[in-house]
Amino acid sequence: MNFVLILMTNTLLALLLMIITFWLPQLNSYMEKSTPYECGFDPMSPARVPFSMKFFLVAITFLLFDLEIALLLPLPWALQTANLPLMVTSSLLLITILALSLAYEWLQKGLDWTE
């Protein structure tokens, strides 16, 4: 009985709040307030603005390295495998590829977006 009373009270309170919000008028509604918010961008500016290709390449590089780091996360659980030499070899190969690709990006100035 107590649970039913709590459930009905919460339902009635939710319905009352929904009815109140639908009946109250929208105050201060103007064009910019009714547009969706896009973090940091002016919603009234033109849509075709130039985009930094260097920043885009750094973002793609970050996504690739983030994916490789996600591949490294299950390595502690992989130590429990029966075929330990194969697991160690494959993990060292993955870490070597990650280090070499980071060195390549660094030498090619792919991580500097200020230039």
UniProtKB/Swiss-Prot annotation:
GO terms of molecular function: NADH dehydrogenase (ubiquinone) activity
Keywords recorded for this protein, A-Z: Electron transport, Membrane, Mitochondrion, Mitochondrion inner membrane, NAD, Respiratory chain, Translocase, Transmembrane, Transmembrane helix, Transport, Ubiquinone
Enzyme class name: translocase
Membrane-topology descriptor: Multi-pass membrane protein
Cleaved signal peptide residues: none
UniProt catalytic activity: a ubiquinone + NADH + 5 H(+)(in) = a ubiquinol + NAD(+) + 4 H(+)(out)
The family this protein is said to belong to: Belongs to the complex I subunit 3 family.
Protein's recorded name: NADH-ubiquinone oxidoreductase chain 3
Organism: Pan troglodytes (Chimpanzee)
Gene (name only): MT-ND3
